[in-house]
């Protein structure tokens, strides 16, 4: 049964304006927006990415969609750090919850989140479905 649904869209250029150039690992590691949004493992991928702004935009959209599916948005006990986006062995995106996000998922009797991320030239979008 579906217990939550969330979607988000991000203008990639808006994020890219706040991100240092690819290859500048030191500056990327200090990027304030990335440090706020990304977990430690996501940050390592971001710093090594050839398109860090696009990577961050997609993760931002995915985390916002997940927070909306939880019914809280970011805040009210759920932070960006409580939602981690990874990829399985086939490259499919996965959403994982910890802390306040995991607590909220349990309150909804949720057991799993399904994530779809898409991007094109100007926009990144994500949808999360939570199931019980």
UniProtKB/Swiss-Prot annotation:
Localization per record: Cytoplasm
Keywords, ordered alphabetically: Cytoplasm, Fatty acid biosynthesis, Fatty acid metabolism, Lipid biosynthesis, Lipid metabolism, Magnesium, Metal-binding, Transferase
InterPro entries to which the protein is assigned, alphabetical: 4-PPantetheinyl_Trfase_dom, 4-PPantetheinyl_Trfase_dom_sf, ACPS, Ppantetheine-prot_Trfase_dom
SUPFAM superfamilies: 4'-phosphopantetheinyl transferase
Catalysed reactions, semicolon-separated: apo-[ACP] + CoA = holo-[ACP] + adenosine 3',5'-bisphosphate + H(+)
GO cellular component terms listed in the entry, alphabetical order: cytoplasm
Cofactor dependence: Mg(2+)
Domain of life: Bacteria
GO molecular function: holo-[acyl-carrier-protein] synthase activity; magnesium ion binding
A biological process from GO: fatty acid biosynthetic process
EC number: 2.7.8.7
Subcellular location, principal: cytoplasm
Residues reported in the UniProt entry to bind Mg(2+): 8, 64
Functional note: Transfers the 4'-phosphopantetheine moiety from coenzyme A to a Ser of acyl-carrier-protein.
The family this protein is said to belong to: Belongs to the P-Pant transferase superfamily. AcpS family.
Name of the molecule in the record: Holo-[acyl-carrier-protein] synthase
């Amino acid at each position: 049964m579906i217990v939550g649904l969330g979607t988000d869209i991000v203008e990639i250029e808006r994020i890219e304006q706040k991100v240092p150039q690819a290859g500048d690992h030191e500056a990327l590691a200090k990027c304030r927006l990335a440090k706020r949004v990304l977990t430690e493992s996501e940050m390592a991928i971001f710093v090594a990415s050839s398109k860090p702004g696009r990577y961050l935009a997609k993760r931002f959209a995915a985390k916002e969609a997940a927070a909306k599916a939880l019914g809280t948005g970011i805040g009210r006990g759920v932070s960006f750090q409580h939602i981690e986006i990874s990829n399985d062995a086939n490259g499919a995106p996965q959403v994982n919850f910890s802390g306040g996000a995991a607590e909220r998922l349990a309150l909804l009797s949720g057991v799993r989140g399904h994530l779809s991320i898409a991007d094109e030239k100007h926009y990144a979008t994500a949808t999360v479905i939570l199931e019980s």
